[in-house]
Structure formats: C-alpha cells, structure tokens
Amino acid sequence: YFGQGVRVLYLDTGYELGHTAYDSLNLIAQYDFVNNDENTANETDQEILENQDNHGTLCLSVMAGYAPGNLIGPAFKSEYLLAKTEIMAEEIQQEEDNYVAALEWGESLGADIACASLGYLDWYSYEDLDGNSAVTTIAVDIASNLGVLCINSAGNEGDDPWYYIIAPADADSVISVGAVNRDGT
C-alpha cells in the first residue's frame, strides 16, 4: 500500500515540482496563499526568492517522492493538494492566516489528511500554547472535527533555547511529530 485513495493537503514554503522525485506526483490542485495564485513554486516577480521552495520540496519528498534507487516516500500514490503558506523573509502572523485558509481550502477539496512541518511561536508566550488559544491550533481542531487527520511537526526550533512544542502542535486533535539527535538533544 502506497497511499492510494488518500487525498493529502501539504502546507509549506513552496515546491519545486520539476524534481525527478515528483515525476509521478498525483497533483490535484495547488494554491499560493502568499501571492494569491496557483503557482506554489518560485515566481520571478516575487520579492523574496531565496530558498522559497527548499523546505517544502524537501519535506514533501519524504512523503510523496518517488525515485527508485534513491528515494521512495511511503505515500507516493496519494493524491496531493499543495498549499504555499509561508513568507520566507520574516515570521509574521499573516502566515497563520494563510495556514488557516489553506486548511479550509483543503477540506473543501476533500483532503483526508493535512500535513505540515511548520509552526508558530514568535507572537505567543508559553502560556498561550494551551491547546485553545493559537489561531492555527483552533483551526486544526476544527479541521479534525470535520474529518481531516491533521499532522504537524512539534516544532522547528532546532537548537534554539525554546524547548516546548509550538502552535498548532499544541492542539488536542493533532498528531504532533518531533525528533531528537543521537545525544538526546
């Protein structure tokens, strides 16, 4: 089984779909919530191009990539909805609004799963991450109640001094995924 019959919404920075690992990607729809168009790759008329699609391309490949002998993602036969939600130049609250809009869009197109390796922290305190306050946390709970299985990274903070999960990983209806290095850090 390789994900047949499952529709996945993937939210991230953007995607370089010209990569050979995506030659057989079953792309149903894509939308750029940053620039309000249907191109989730780099666009030459955008102000910030650097690494615009790097994170999204890499993360999506873990799930959907198919390049025998190099990479085979576990769900390369799923149907995909791709949403570009992140503004690379800075961390701003608009990204959370984009995330929410993408969840609504994906749910309206029949997404079974919503997956993101994104999170929001800069404008929240530890106390705000209570599972009920962050905009994306509330949206993930609503999407889950509508039947969308939501999966999100626990955080993207790396070696930063913040050692807690970030929104929307604090939602009670999300599967939150984290990792540590070999030495436990």
Predicted ranges, named:
Residues 1-95, 109-112, 145-147, 170-174, ...:
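Subtilisin-like serine protease catalytic core
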Residues 59, 99, 103, 108-185:
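Catalytic-core segments of hydrolase enzymes
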